[in-house]
């Protein structure tokens, strides 16, 4: 796995869960990870305006936070960051292609089918468009185990 693992970071829990899973795999395999925050301020407005700058700042904050956490837990993993001014799915696929990544890791935040259809789902789009394998990781909250019912 010379190209490593590209990870989609969107500022939410599912991207962080994907990053943790990717770091754990990267540590086992001896490959780097690339945290990717793709953003498009507005397809209707001018590029480089205040909205786009604010979204990029959110991306910097999110990737910095998860990078710090990952580096502390997996110091052997090389972690890189790319902020890409493209739609998130396009950004992930482009970075994976440019870096010859072996896989893309994305989170699944539990959007229902209707919300995903209305809002769009980066995970869905990457899974269906990427020529590379895609690892889909549930949000950290999704893998909590419910406590066993109390005995009567």
State where each predicted segment sits.
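Charged docking surfaces used in two-component/phosphorelay signaling
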Residues: 83-91
């Amino acid at each position: 796995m010379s190209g490593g693992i590209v990870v989609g970071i969107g500022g939410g829990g599912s991207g962080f869960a994907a990053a943790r899973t990717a770091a754990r795999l990267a540590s086992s395999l001896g490959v780097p990870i690339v945290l990717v925050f793709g953003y498009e301020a507005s397809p209707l407005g001018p590029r480089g305006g205040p909205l786009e700058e604010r979204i990029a700042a959110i991306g910097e904050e999110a990737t910095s936070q998860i990078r710090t956490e990952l580096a502390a837990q997996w110091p052997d993993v090389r972690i890189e960051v790319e902020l890409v001014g493209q739609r998130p799915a396009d950004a992930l696929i482009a970075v994976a292609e440019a870096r010859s990544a072996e896989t893309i890791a994305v989170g699944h935040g539990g959007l229902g089918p209707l919300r995903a259809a209305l809002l769009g789902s980066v995970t869905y789009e990457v899974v269906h468009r990427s020529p590379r394998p895609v690892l889909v990781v549930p949000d950290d909250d999704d893998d909590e185990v419910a406590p066993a019912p109390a005995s009567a």
